[in-house]
């Protein structure tokens, strides 16, 4: 049986823990054929690990899209898009394709950075991406920005944010709580427009988790492409990334990536699913 084809529209992380590198590794681990349309190149200062984001010229981006669409992706994922123009174009690309699924990872900051890359991007995501999204996968900060609620401190806050984001057009919302809500458990919240589900795993080490968000969204995309329902896809993605985080490793004094192959090579992590 031919592999399902999945396209990521994302930036390149030169350290290869996040970005399109994380996406392609995850797609391969989950038996899909990964393709990429690159939006930007992210490099790091060797002494401070501060990030430098270099956008690619729009004509180069368009040529990549032309190639990818000629192949015909079954599912499309977005990551770091960088500019309002590219955000708008990503939504148009999904509509122009025959892809069944559109997963939006609303990347707003680089790991370790505190400021939104481009504040205008948030409104562009709300306008051009959320109404088309099969699943949107914000972390707590991103969910606070997309919903307009700001800082989210509890499951109840996450439920309010998920409802607002759903009402903006996303078909399914999964908010990643991670380590922010509890030191012993990792909580995510999934909402399908009718029911809220809390997805829980044990909390594993958090020192080496670079690329966790990209990996989660990429896994969701691959699972959707291979036939899982959105609910099944996000639960499976939670298990996949939990294994990756648990087995994360130290790259240098500044960062350590998740192990994208841990789910298949080392262990599966159980996910507790409860209505809340």
Swiss-Prot record:
Q: Which Gene3D superfamilies match?
A: 3.40.1190.20
Pfam families cross-referenced by the UniProt entry: Phos_pyr_kin
Q: Which reaction does it catalyse?
A: pyridoxal + ATP = pyridoxal 5'-phosphate + ADP + H(+)
Give GO terms for biological process. Answer: thiamine biosynthetic process
Question: Which keywords does this Swiss-Prot/TrEMBL entry list?
Answer: ATP-binding, Kinase, Magnesium, Metal-binding, Nucleotide-binding, Transferase
Q: Name one GO molecular function term.
A: hydroxymethylpyrimidine kinase activity
Q: What class of enzyme is it?
A: transferase
Q: Which family does it belong to?
A: Belongs to the ThiD family.
**Known PANTHER family for this protein?**
PHOSPHOMETHYLPYRIMIDINE KINASE, PYRIDOXINE KINASE
Name of the protein in question: Putative pyridoxine kinase
Q: Which organism is it from?
A: Staphylococcus aureus (strain COL)
**Its encoding gene is what?**
pdxK
């Amino acid at each position: 049986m031919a592999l399902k084809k999945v396209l990521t529209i994302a930036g390149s992380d030169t350290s290869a823990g996040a970005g399109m590198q994380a996406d392609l590794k995850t797609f391969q681990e989950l038996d899909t054929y990964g393709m990429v349309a690159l939006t930007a190149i992210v490099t790091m200062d060797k002494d401070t690990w501060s990030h430098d984001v270099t956008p690619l010229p729009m004509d180069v981006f368009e040529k990549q899209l032309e190639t990818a669409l000629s192949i015909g992706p079954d599912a499309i994922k977005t990551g770091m898009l960088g500019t309002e123009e590219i955000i708008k174009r990503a939504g148009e690309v999904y509509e122009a394709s025959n892809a069944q699924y559109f997963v939006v990872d609303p990347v707003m900051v680089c790991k370790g950075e505190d400021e939104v890359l481009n504040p205008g991007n948030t409104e562009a995501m709300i306008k051009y991406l959320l109404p088309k999204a099969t699943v949107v996968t914000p972390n707590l900060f991103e969910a606070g920005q997309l919903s307009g609620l700001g800082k989210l401190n509890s499951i109840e806050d996450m439920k309010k944010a998920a409802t607002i984001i759903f009402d903006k057009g996303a078909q399914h919302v999964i908010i990643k709580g991670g380590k922010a809500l509890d030191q012993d458990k990792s909580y995510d919240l999934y909402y399908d427009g009718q029911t809220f589900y809390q997805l829980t795993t044990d909390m594993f080490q958090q020192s080496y988790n670079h690329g966790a968000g990209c990996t989660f969204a990429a896994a969701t995309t691959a699972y959707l492409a291979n036939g899982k329902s959105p609910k099944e896809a996000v639960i499976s993605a939670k298990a996949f990334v939990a294994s990756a985080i648990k087995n994360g490793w130290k790259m240098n004094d500044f960062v350590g990536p998740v192990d994208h192959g841990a789910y298949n090579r080392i262990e599966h992590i159980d996910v507790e699913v409860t209505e809340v």
